[in-house]
A protein has these predicted regions:
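Single conserved hydrophobic/aromatic residue that forms the stacking wall/gate
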Residues: 1-9
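Non-catalytic carbohydrate-binding regions of carbohydrate-active enzymes
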Residues: 14-113, 117-123
């Protein structure tokens, strides 16, 4: 059975090897987390699921990381919030420039951005 990003969130299947790979994958990226490593031969900066940053993926990974590596989770959260603040509610973004692509005023970007910034406000 293959495991998708949903499993990362629902079952918290993150282990140290996965976290290490995520850190390595993101270490040279200004905007986290690209859907394909920028140095991979299949990387395409503007093409669906071939390289862009997706806020929904960052959100799922952040939620899965919170109980495993809070420092890295907070880095993803902070960079995701900053990306949306700077570039807007686009569907997806360049991992190199942060430029938004796809639909503008995209609802899942807006909803997940709100979830991230409002988290812990009522605690």
């Amino acid at each position: 059975r293959s495991r998708g990003l949903g499993d990362v969130y629902k079952r918290q299947v993150l282990n140290n090897k996965i976290i290490k790979n995520l850190k390595k994958h993101s270490s040279k990226e200004k905007y986290l987390l690209s859907s394909v490593k920028p140095n991979h031969q299949k990387f395409e900066e503007k093409r669906y699921w071939r390289g862009p940053v997706w806020i929904n993926c960052n959100w799922i990974i952040y939620k899965g990381l919170k109980n495993k590596n809070i420092k890295f989770a907070q880095q993803i959260k902070r960079k995701t919030i900053n990306l949306v603040k700077q570039k807007g509610f686009n569907e997806y973004f360049s991992c190199k420039t942060g430029k938004g692509f796809g639909a503008t005023n995209f609802s899942w970007t807006a909803a997940l951005f709100l979830d991230l910034i409002l988290e812990n406000k009522n605690d």
